Amino acid sequence: MEMQTNPEDQQAQLNRVESFGESLLRLRKEAIDARIASGIERIWLEDEEHYEGIDELNRGQERSAWASKPPGRSDPSRYQNRSIVFPNITRPYVDAAAAKIGDTLLPTDDKAWSLKPTPIPELMLIAEGNLPAPVQQGMEEVGVPPETQEQVAQIEAQEAARQIKEAKDRAAKAEQRIEDWHVECQFHAEMRRVIDDACKIGSGVIKGPVPALKRQQMFIDGMLVIKEEVKPISKRIDPWNFFPAAGCGDSIHNGSYCWERDYLTAKKLEELKSDPSYIASQIDLCIDEGPKKAGSIRKTTDGKDVDDKNLFEVWYFYGVADKEDLEAAGVEVPEGIRHIPAIVTFVNDRVVKAALSPLENGELPYDIFAYQRRVGAPWGTGVSRQIRTPQEMVTAGVRTMLTNAGRAAGPMMVFKNNVIPADGTNDITPWKVYYASDDDATDDARKLISLIQFPDLQGSLMNIVQFGMKLAEDVTGL
């Protein structure tokens, strides 16, 4: 960014940039608060837990971040003397759905799309030698000889055929170019990650196409040549790091803006100063301040909290900005435009870069793939949520069955008061010796100890498990 040389003008410019940033930060707070209020973050966390096979009872057995009890959850330590296994049917159903969608939309070594020119009925008729009726009628009215009419029809047919062929050739070349871009940016790999997110938590976020600088190294005539090109790419965005506009409804494109969160180390942030489009003085202030956090807790793709206290939060705003604000941030804005789509980058709530949107119409370069749409929300419902009730039924049935099996594995023993173990303990061991009092009237030792067998209910409990498995198939369609 080019700063003013006059100190007063320079300070005024920075003040304008700071004011510009504060106005956008209010929109960020609205977006963050709206997503929290929607309850979708709690749903994501619950869906991630079931995918990982974690719930209240077995949380303490997990050797990971899941072991910490989230707010509002019961303490697992109070559940004793019962089975805590988690028969995870959520993960295979989620993975099966993702594989099925991926194989359908992203076939291996092929593409699931093609480009063809739009058909023009009039042009197709002319290519077959049939002139439009008004043209044919006009030539007859002015007395054009039939031979001349035939020549005109042939010439027009040749021209129409040429245009049709040219359109097909252009479509084929455009298709090849787009496919080349997809291969270079690993579009299939990124989309499979988006599909995984959608099947797991209901929503997958894809960003693109957006311009990105690609560097290629090659040897030409024995010399190393480094070539830099700007090419369109698409990439997957973690749903935890995407914040659509508050009140956008069921489509993020109904909102006027959106925010994306990313993270940078201090080293990477320092390297941005070499880019003249960044405001170096603002970056220096950010590094001096240290990392600050503005959003909700960062999660990994499996929902665990991330230790990112040494990382700087980077926020990208996509929306409409005023001409004067962009010019204060060093952006050259065309004349005659007062409001223009822009991209503004924040670090530590400071504007470090502003640029015009590469899309002239201002369309947001994001899309949310919802596995099953929710009414009035851009987020979707995933397989993990669809199968939640069957998963709980299967889990409860298996745990009760195993608890029952453990209790039915051995009998309950009832001793009369005058029966005393020789070793002073009630442990059941071979060659155990007991003493019976001489005062006891019976001479049959078996009457001094009674065995009660706990009922084995595995058959009836397995019916509950089987019903849960059948219900899982019905609710998912898999």
Where are these regions (language model features)?
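Extended, helix-rich architectural segments
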Residues: 1-352, 457-460, 464-467
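Extended, charged amphipathic alpha-helical segments
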Residues: 312-478
